[in-house]
């Protein structure tokens, strides 16, 4: 039987990979900032924490995070029953996975091309 936490991580990752266009920024630094911004704000929304909206970038990431958090709560109702610590751990694992898939493990040479 597969580990339930891996199943949950795979479901959240799969949702992003199939439904979120923000993962396709063309530069490494764009992807790093967006992954950090969107996934941090998604975690804050899911935890009911206050979200920083002080900059235009914060507000942009918030818009994507709000959609992602709403989708997660609807598509994966188990997320609503997680403890704060479980959710924090899962969201960190998700960020690590998305960073790997979209940045460090990506074969897209444009991500590191200094002329692009």
Swiss-Prot record:
GO molecular function: ATP binding; iron ion binding; iron-sulfur cluster binding; nitrogenase activity
Gene Ontology BP annotations: nitrogen fixation
Highest taxon above the source species: Bacteria
Record keyword Signal present: no
Matching Pfam families: AnfG_VnfG
EC number: 1.18.6.1
Transmembrane regions: none
InterPro entries: Nase_Fe-Fe_dsu, V/Nase_d_su
Cofactor annotation: iron-sulfur cluster
Protein name: Nitrogenase iron-iron protein delta chain
Encoding gene per record: anfG
